[in-house]
Amino acid sequence: MTSSPHKLAVEELTVAFGHGRRARTVLRGVSTGVRTGQTLGLVGESGSGKSTIAKAIVGTHRARAGRILLDGEDLTGLGRREFAAVRRRVQLVSQDPYASLNPRMTIGEAIAEAVDPLRADARKHAATVERWLGTVALDGSAADRYPHEFSGGQRQRIAVARALAVEPEVLIADEITSALDASVQAEVLNLLEELRRSLSLTMIFISHDLAVVRHVSDEVAVLCQGELVEQGPVRDVYHAPQHPYTRRLLASVPTFEEKEEAA
């Protein structure tokens, strides 16, 4: 275990798909991290490697090289059983909540399954289910309903509740507002900020929307074609971007300068 200023960090992380001549490197030596209680925004265009970092952290993708550190402990060297125990400390909420919810399970069963994977007993965990539904501003009666009975914004809240039910230390939100309309998007963003403060969560927020990332993040890391090109406090990166790619991204947001003038 090594000392680190970060709660969660990746060091020289490389991820590649395939082998030999057909291998395709999607992350090249990326180093970034998030401090305890803060939110790191990961931005970049489609294919930049944002989601790959998240999936490598939770073990969906395997690191070809580099380290993934949680409280200074390298997760890449852990065995399956050890990693499973650590995995509950870091939860990922993805863009499509419907895909992450079993359509044959009630919401109560889905949350109970997160708490106890061997027995998804909604009655046994009724208090826990009601607590976390309430935390994301949903009524306890939602526990008896099925995923298709909810709107996209409500399903995203349910996915967040399910992730929080195991009481993680780090929450990774991967494009969770991209499919929502503006008003619902604002509700979810405000909810995340409230949860971060009330639960002392550390967060990684992934999005291609620079305005959204600016709203929720303390620091921002900019990715381009699998490489980290810039990182720093949100205000520094947005007001004085150093890398040409970052400047191009900011220039592509039509309302960015207008919002700055109105502020």
Identify the meaning behind each predicted range:
Residues 20-22, 62, 75-91, 109, ...:
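ABC ATPase NBD coupling module
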Residues 66-74:
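Conserved ABC transporter NBD signature motif
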Residues 58:
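Helix-to-loop junction immediately C-terminal to a conserved catalytic motif
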Residues 146-150, 154:
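Conserved ABC ATPase signature
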Residues 74, 123-141, 250-251:
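Conserved ABC ATPase "signature" region
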Residues 165-169:
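A short, proline-enriched helix->beta-strand linker immediately N-terminal to the Walker B motif
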